[in-house]
Amino acid sequence: MFLLLRFVLVSCIIGSLGFDNPPTNVVSHLNGDWFLFGDSRSDCNHVVNTNPRNYSYMDLNPALCDSGKISSKAGNSIFRSFHFTDFYNYTGEGQQIIFYEGVNFTPYHAFKCTTSGSNDIWMQNKGLFYTQVYKNMAVYRSLTFVNVPYVYNGSAQSTALCKSGSLVLNNPAYIAREANFGDYYYKVEADFYLSGCDEYIVPLCIFNGKFLSNTKYYDDSQYYFNKDTGVIYGLNSTETITTGFDFNCHYLVLPSGNYLAISNELLLTVPTKAICLNKRKDFTPVQVVDSRWNNARQSDNMTAVACQPPYCYFRNSTTNYVGVYDINHGDAGFTSILSGLLYDSPCFSQQGVFRYDNVSSVWPLYSYGRCPTAADINTPDVPICVYDPLPLILLGILLGVAVIIIVVLLLYFMVDNGTRLHDA
């Protein structure tokens, strides 16, 4: 009892001296088992090869360049590499995963499959993609890309139907119509194989609208059939619009196996790349840093939409991105957020990272790690320490029971002693 009272007293004294331990707006890690995926703002090789010694180009502290815990590529992103010919093989492994990328596919790039397409659909695709990546990297240690081999028995080749500017879609691949087909009302299939990983993220995409070709309108229809388990995954066009639609993608998490891609109308699509997920781990929320341009360019909030508790913590700066190298590279606010990678921290929460695990001015929500078990609330003159009441209630009950037992024993011995004196 004395030790408990002393702990409460010491904590209150600490509170009166102004020790708050507030959550800080950084990304950090419990220990050295972490990994960061990024772009030019954390690409040390780009700085060395293109901008020698000018580390102001990055938001990452250059002390981390030789850590071996970073997979970053200037001008790229995981989503961009997943879908397009502009490819970088992001590869990394860790218990705690941090993402600071995504800005290299935004409304600024204005990508759409056709001239009458919709970039809004591609922003939706981006959000759905990162949702799957973040959720799965909370339970997997390792991420990399793998090629998906497929076999199509026809003579037609894949076609670059979906392209805009410098971006050319190659995942999924479009198989062109066979020369002997007069229209797109036909069924066609291709085999593809997934092997070597625990699970895979693959795209299943359709044009969700009436696709016009030579005065005829078509409804897209695509399926993947797992020949080992009998499970089928499919999408059918449900919209009646004829303009303003685009390539809607769902991102499936599939096991290894032999699959059949099936098209009942329009062109056959088949996956050519997959995110390879390996090495299951205990649930560990990922951390995502907002990836956006200076306000002179249009950005999106899809990584924020995708990053939701409990599987993900989102960190952002409250000000416009204004770099010191140029307006899009070397921002002080985001440099501060990434500075947390220089040290270990015991506790992570929706509000931020806690540097200490004793008391805090803020109760951590969706907490992970060794987190404060007390909230230190300061009134103007009197520090009040509010603790989780359950341990105190249980201790009070135990003390009450002990007092009752002591009183009963005292009464018993007093009565017994009086009886013996009377007998004497």
Swiss-Prot record:
Catalytic residues in the record: S40, D326, H329
Annotated effect of mutating L267A: Loss of receptor binding
Enzyme class: hydrolase
Reactions this protein catalyses: N-acetyl-9-O-acetylneuraminate + H2O = N-acetylneuraminate + acetate + H(+); N-acetyl-4-O-acetylneuraminate + H2O = N-acetylneuraminate + acetate + H(+)
Keywords attached to this entry: Disulfide bond, Glycoprotein, Hemagglutinin, Host cell membrane, Host membrane, Hydrolase, Membrane, Signal, Transmembrane, Transmembrane helix, Viral envelope protein, Virion
Glycosylation (residues): N54, N89, N153, N236, N301, N316, N358, N417
Side of membrane Virion surface, spans: 17-392
InterPro entries referenced in this protein's UniProt entry, alphabetically: Capsid_hemagglutn, HEMA, Hemagglutn-estrase_core, Hemagglutn-estrase_hemagglutn
Protein name: Hemagglutinin-esterase
Keyword Glycoprotein: yes
Role noted for this protein: Structural protein that makes short spikes at the surface of the virus. Contains receptor binding and receptor-destroying activities. Mediates de-O-acetylation of N-acetyl-4-O-acetylneuraminic acid, which is probably the receptor determinant recognized by the virus on the surface of erythrocytes and susceptible cells. This receptor-destroying activity is important for virus release as it probably helps preventing self-aggregation and ensures the efficient spread of the progeny virus from cell to cell.
Keyword Oxidoreductase attached: no
Gene: HE
Transmembrane spans: 393-413
Entry EC number(s): 3.1.1.53
Protein's membrane topology: Single-pass type I membrane protein
